[in-house]
């Protein structure tokens, strides 16, 4: 329990300080501080992200972020992608997943360096939101991340959303995406579900 508390607390603090999603922090901490393998940790991380994203998303809504109908397309794409990514996890070797995760960390570093400054072009085509949802959902299901580190720039560039609106969209879409990934990976294992819940609540 203490390790889960530390993982949730440290993950939550670093996520807030660095402006990155919880999964980018939770997965490495779980891998370092527990004896579970990488694939299991991605499922636990997805479970934790449900709670972290719910709290953050609620804050954005309370602060007046307006959600358009396009959020539904993003959510549908995320659910489909989350399921696909979760199924792919079982088919890909652990070492390969770890390498993919390492590449993601490099992308995170680059995005932090760019400080979220992206040129955008307004687009209301639902197709773009569905594709963005699927692509980021696959990453979420595959690696146990929220997907915002990729989803937000795509929403700004292809959806023409302002940064703060894109963040709100991303957080809301993360919740059902992470739920899909967590249920697919952890179904039938209440102990792992409980661990992910604790981390999410502590975060």
For each feature predicted by the language model, list its residue ranges.
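Juxtamembrane transmembrane-helix boundary motif
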Residues: 1-17, 25-27, 31-33, 38-40, ...
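Small-residue hotspots at the loop-to-helix junctions and early N-terminal turns
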Residues: 42, 46, 163-171
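Alpha-helix initiation and capping sites
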Residues: 148-149, 173
